[in-house]
Curated annotation (Swiss-Prot):
Keywords: Host cytoplasm, Host nucleus. This is UL84 protein. The gene is UL84. Pfam families: Cytomega_UL84. InterPro entries: Herpes_UL84. The keyword Methyltransferase does not apply. A motif (Nuclear export signal 1 (NES 1)) lies at residues 229-238. A motif (Nuclear localization signal) lies at residues 161-170. Plays an essential role in viral DNA replication. May participate in the DNA replication initiation by interacting with the origin of lytic replication, oriLyt and subsequently recruiting other viral/cellular factors. Additionally, interacts with and shuttles IRS1 viral mRNA from the host nucleus to the cytoplasm.
Amino acid sequence: MPRADPNLRNRARRPRARRGGGGGVGSNSSRHSGKCRRQRRALSAPPLTFLATTTTTTMMGVASTDDDSLLLKTPDELDKHSGSPQTILTLTDKHDIRQPRVHRGTYHLIQLHLDLRPEELRDPFQILLSTPLQLGEANGESQTAPATSQEEETAASHELEKKKEKEEKKEEEDEDDRNDDRERGILCVVSNEDSDVRPAFSLFPARPGCHILRSVIDQQLTRMAIVRLSLNLFALRIITPPLKRVPLRRKAAHHTALHDCMALHLPELTFESTLDINNVTENAASVADAAESTDADLTPTLTVRVRHAVCWHRVEGGISGPRGLTSRISARLSETTAKTLGPSVFGRLELDPNESPPDLTLSSLTLYQDGMLRFNVTCDRTEAPADPVAFRLRLRRETVRRPFFSDAPLPYFVPPRSGAADEGLEVRVPYELTLKNSHTLRIYRRFYGPYLGVFVPHNRQGLKMPVTVWLPRSWLELTVLVSDENGATFPRDALLGRLYFISSKHTLNRGCLSAMTHQVKSTLHSRSTSHSPSQQQLSVLGASIALEDLLPMRLASPETEPQDCKLTENTTEKTSPVTLAMVCGDL
């Protein structure tokens, strides 16, 4: 099963015959195509596994080597040999299955190149890569010195105290606080610009197991003598937006479409300010005390307590917020309180476990110019909750270092039901939708922050949805292409796809901001910057990302070695691989 032609070591540099037969192909190309076909007779059946020849390229794009001795070195020795740990690993289909080689090291980009015959694409399942793979720390790796026994005992006692404090405050905390400012990594697989086969743009959690790439085979590919499959594999930094915090919006005019279900007065309002000086927290007794501190030291907080019987109105979702039963509550703030709150104020609900509906959410929060504060609370149910309803609305000035939505994310954006934050938010249809023709579905939510939203569609028969880039301060518009003559029907809560927010540093290419295609491609190029005269960057989805801003991917041996144990979370005798496989057929 080996492919032992030394002339095919670097397939990217040789001309490839594009079409077989006699249609405009020269004699040299015909002989070359026949030679390739004879060499590939032993490879007509999958699986195909990349496990051999490597080309390690430094970030500056100067050094390139095919020295097999690099494969026998430790990761540290490999990094020293290449001159930089930020490298590109290039894998080809040239391998020996009797003596598979393991590519150990840390890389920012893995390129897979494979030349196939058209009939090989008919095989439904092909393994492209199978290797133990681990991502680096998203927020930076930290090394600590070994602690003494006394330090370990002290640390253990502190851990117990912290654990008790966390258990006491567990009811007050929410998922937003526990995941605050945490970046995660996700694997991205996309075709290279010289690839004939264009699999669908795919994002995968970096967990062991088999991940499927789907690809549609064009009829033109069947007339080629050799078909090139070229993929780029890299890891993006992603971050999860807060789902239980709603920003305070300020407006000048009142809207009287919905009357206030209840009006609160000053006794139900509590204004306090948290003063943080030299890690000592104090509560200012009044607004006057709070005004003496600077904005950098002052964190004003307004708490609105509600324990009343309220009226409920039915809404179907949309701009007004989530669907279900909603109640509109108002409270008039004094001019001093409204001024002291300042900008960048977020609100969230604190529920009473005994008297609050568990599905109660904050759907909108608005402060008008005359000091009137109005907010809507919604619960997704058909029957009104029992009276009275008890909860607290807490408004707090804070700096959110994550993307946040203009209004409540529900019912459009839902956390993944599996609970894994690296799987992105689920984008669902809030109501039953029937389409006869192609349609643009607009979701009336904006997000803010220096991030890039990416919508990856879910596979659905009879429909085609392109990968869509979502820019800050804009609506999310999804294009649905209906291929079935009878149209398509989306039931309520149908899954459209997943939404990710990329936190890797990037620059936008204004010429191609939206990836309104089904088959996305990527390009590796060099760009001069103020920090580097020749910086290697990867362009994908209308954005360019420097390789150094991608998460490093560490390839380990199948058997865990002593120096690898400290880098793995669950130390086992054998590390499970991350496997990529391609399925040809309908997207």
